[in-house]
Amino acid sequence: MRVVGILPARLSSTRLPRKPILAETGKTLIQHTWEVASQATSLDAVIVAADCDELADAVNSFGGHVELTGEHLSGTDRIAEVVERCCPDAEIIVNIQGDEPEIDPAHIDAAVSALESHPDWQMTTLVTPLTDPELLASPNVVKAVCAEDGRALYFSRSVVPFSRDESVEKVLKSGNSPWRHHIGLYAYRREFLLKLTQLPPSPLEQLEKLEQLRALENGATIGVVEVSESAPGIDTPEDYQQFVARWREANG
């Protein structure tokens, strides 16, 4: 089964302009992420889906595989263009965020393995236990509600499931949190990904601004894999400086 990882990337980030090619460590951010993703043993290829020539040149400079795409509303649409044009023999496509240079390659492998093991699932994603009340309350932290058999039931920016009888603090103190933090890594079956990106935005997707709800609202099964922790994303200048500090500490 051929599996391809694709990193959607663009220079026009509003909170952190030119994010993929920031290079205070001596390597661009997109190179860090590409190199880590390439360590996933499940992937036969890793491709960067770039939005402009400057970014494509940066990827070519370190020997990465890059495909230039047109303008798109989402990273998923950007990936679909690359898949349709360049990956005719791929069976599974993994959407890897281009701004997560500390992602664990084993997490990529776990998402792929779960999809390979469940032929009735159309896609898989990751979650991690959510135990911090501040993160739980934040609309920027997406919560996942999961069934016992590993299927996703819903994703929301609200606190779901809702605890009617006990406070959030009391539930968390019990040491058995029912809440899960959704991690935005996805493994798709190729044909399902192409079909999904042709569907119009769904009502709940538009309400929550969560693209994965389009799949649920159209009857797809999303499998969920729980991992112990999530890699910090880089969305702001502060996030990037913290990454640089961690990298320098780890690399002397």
Mark where each language-model region is.
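N-terminal glycine-rich phosphate-binding loop and ensuing alpha1 helix
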Residues: 2-49
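Short phosphate-binding loop-to-helix
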Residues: 47, 53-113
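Short, high-confidence coil segments that cap the C-terminus of an alpha-helix
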Residues: 43, 88-90, 119-121, 220
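A conserved hydrophobic position in a structured secondary element of the catalytic/binding core
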Residues: 50-51, 103, 188, 235
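Conserved core of the sugar-phosphate nucleotidyltransferase
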Residues: 103-202
